[in-house]
């Protein structure tokens, strides 16, 4: 009698789950399970993201129990877990079939290869499916003539050639499962600190609720242009995301990317709407682009031997990195964003622009890989391909980066492309030392007269740090360093991409090089006729997959 295991990994959902559908169609008995792999320990995963994972597992278990099944949660090395499941020593008899979705991260490839060999040696039928992206990443990269995409135009061409996106799959009728034990652990069993009460509840049901809430406002979906969203949240709540807030749910697969795509498409159908890269479809396409780059480019996560990375002699100062990570640089906007990240696991994409630029080419001249590691641990929506792609982009070292001389001002004014609210409420929420500081000085408190500082109960240099660097001096020095590196041959041997294809621009697109971050106009090309475009029309702009 066939017993099929469904290994939940990055598709923590019942809807649009091809592995689950195939398992139900193949075997009378189906065992849904998740493995808490010690590879992803506390040194690599922050408490907020781990809590989101556990909440997602609990939600999945609740939905399965409502169908008289359940989720088994095993803890240990995957190979050791499967050795028992394949031999019949596990709690549910011997697995004869194993189904799961593909994972293209480097560690996952090695892990899955070992599991596949173990399955083969044990006579277990194994089948994998592409469930975390619109495109089958490996199949796309393997096609003759494939070139790594470095712009919206190139990823649109690849996606269009792949054909229409299939509709999401319905939840199948899952057979009952009666096995005791192997419960979802509590966060307190793993971490000594409590997760934030702010942020996002994990789970498929919450993901679908949020998607429905977003799509209920059809005008919002049609008008969405990510560069125009506020980095400091909605007007009524400066710390509430001004974007969809769906990125953590896509990261964990609580929400199918196909479901999101088709839901947005339904809203836009027959209406004038924004276009990629600024649109919601554009956000998904950039995610696809980074997944393809991560799979196709060797050492995509490194600053050496990476064809997508200019070789820059970055500094290595642990004190500067720690000040940035902990939100004590003396620049309130930067510090508020980093404290938001530490407390909630979330940061708006323009905030990510600001802090990444500040750490690297803008002010502190630290290696982008150090910032990448901080984001990788703390972000709820941290995703290997997307995180590396964005840091390459924002550090100015990738072929799809903006010109390196376009640097964000860490003290954003009302005309800044960082779209920061000017009342200071966001800063005051996350940097309470400045809660009584006048809005006039909130982004540059060191310029406030001493009387103002005393009135606010915050003496700069005592109650809140002085700026860790002088922005203007650091900016000029870093521009000279970057130019010198380029002049000395920092360009890798091969960047790839088509001649004349500029790649995605940041929110500076269209502006001439110069001081500040004013930039130029952002292009938009709405489909005024309301005609449906499968992949959308390309346009310059900026985006960040996540946030």
Predicted stretch roles:
Residues 70, 78-209, 389-394, 398, ...:
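Beta-rich, aromatic/charged-enriched effector core domains that present basic-aromatic interfaces
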Residues 9-11, 35-37, 76, 103-105, ...:
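An acidic- and aromatic-residue-enriched active-site/binding cleft used to recognize and process polar
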Residues 145-308, 421, 425-531, 536, ...:
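Glycine/tryptophan-enriched, flexible segments
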Residues 1-69, 483, 493, 503:
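N-terminal beta-strand-loop-alpha-helix module at the start
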Residues 46-47, 74-79, 83, 101-106, ...:
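Conserved short loop/turn motifs at secondary-structure junctions
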Residues 16-19, 111-112, 367, 371:
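Residues at alpha-helix caps and immediate loop-helix transition turns in enzyme cores, especially N-
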Residues 239-433, 439:
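Active-site-proximal binding-pocket segments
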């Amino acid at each position: 009698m066939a017993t099929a295991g469904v290994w939940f990994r990055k598709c923590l959902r019942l809807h649009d789950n091809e592995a689950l559908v195939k398992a139900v169609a193949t075997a009378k008995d189906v065992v849904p399970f998740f493995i808490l792999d010690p590879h992803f320990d506390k040194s690599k995963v922050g408490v907020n993201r781990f809590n989101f994972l556990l909440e997602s597992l609990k939600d999945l278990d609740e939905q399965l129990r409502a169908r008289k099944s359940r989720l088994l949660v095993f803890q240990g090395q995957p190979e050791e877990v499967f050795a028992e499941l394949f031999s019949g020593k596990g709690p549910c008899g011997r697995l004869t079939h194993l189904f799961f979705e593909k994972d293209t991260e480097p560690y996952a490839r090695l892990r899955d290869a070992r599991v596949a060999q173990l399955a083969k040696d044990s006579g277990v039928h194994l089948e994998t499916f592409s469930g975390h992206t619109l495109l089958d990443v490996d199949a796309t990269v393997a096609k003759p003539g494939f070139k790594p995409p470095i712009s919206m135009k190139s990823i649109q061409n690849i996606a269009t050639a792949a054909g229409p996106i299939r509709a999401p799959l319905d939840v199948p009728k899952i057979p009952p499962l009666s096995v005791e034990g192997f419960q979802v652990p509590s966060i307190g069993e793993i971490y000594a600190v409590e997760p934030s009460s702010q942020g996002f509840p994990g789970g498929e049901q919450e993901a679908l609720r949020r998607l429905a809430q977003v799509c209920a406002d059809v005008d919002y979906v049609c008008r969405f242009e990510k560069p125009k969203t506020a980095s400091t949240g909605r007007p009524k709540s400066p710390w509430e995301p001004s974007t969809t807030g769906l990125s953590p749910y896509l990261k964990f697969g609580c929400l199918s990317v196909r479901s999101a795509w088709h839901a947005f498409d339904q809203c836009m159908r027959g209406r004038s709407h924004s276009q990629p890269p600024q649109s919601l479809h554009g956000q998904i396409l950039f995610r696809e682009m980074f997944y393809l780059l991560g799979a196709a480019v060797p050492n995509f996560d490194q600053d050496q031997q990476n064809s997508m990375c200019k070789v820059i002699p970055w500094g290595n100062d642990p004190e500067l990195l720690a000040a940035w990570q902990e939100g004590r640089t003396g620049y309130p906007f930067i510090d508020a964003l980093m404290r938001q990240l530490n407390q909630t696991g979330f940061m708006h994409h323009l905030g990510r622009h600001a802090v990444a630029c500040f750490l690297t080419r803008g002010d502190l001249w630290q290696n982008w890989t150090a910032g990448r590691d901080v984001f990788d641990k703390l972000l709820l929506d941290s995703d290997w391909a997307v995180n590396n792609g964005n840091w390459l982009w924002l550090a100015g070292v990738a072929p799809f980066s903006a010109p390196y001389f376009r640097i964000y001002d860490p003290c954003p004014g009302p005309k800044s492309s960082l779209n920061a609210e000017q009342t200071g409420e966001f800063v005051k929420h996350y940097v309470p030392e400045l809660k009584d500081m006048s809005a006039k000085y909130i982004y540059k408190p060191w310029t406030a007269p001493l009387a103002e500082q005393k009135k606010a109960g915050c003496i700069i240099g005592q109650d809140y740090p002085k700026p860790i660097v002088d922005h203007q001096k650091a900016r000029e020095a870093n521009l000279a360093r970057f130019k010198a590196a380029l002049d000395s041959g920092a360009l890798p041997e091969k960047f790839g991409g088509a001649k004349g294809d500029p790649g995605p621009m940041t929110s500076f697109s269209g502006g001439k090089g110069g001081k500040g971050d004013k930039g130029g106009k952002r292009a938009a090309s709405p489909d005024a006729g309301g005609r449906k475009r499968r992949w959308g029309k390309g346009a310059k702009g900026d985006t960040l997959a996540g946030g």
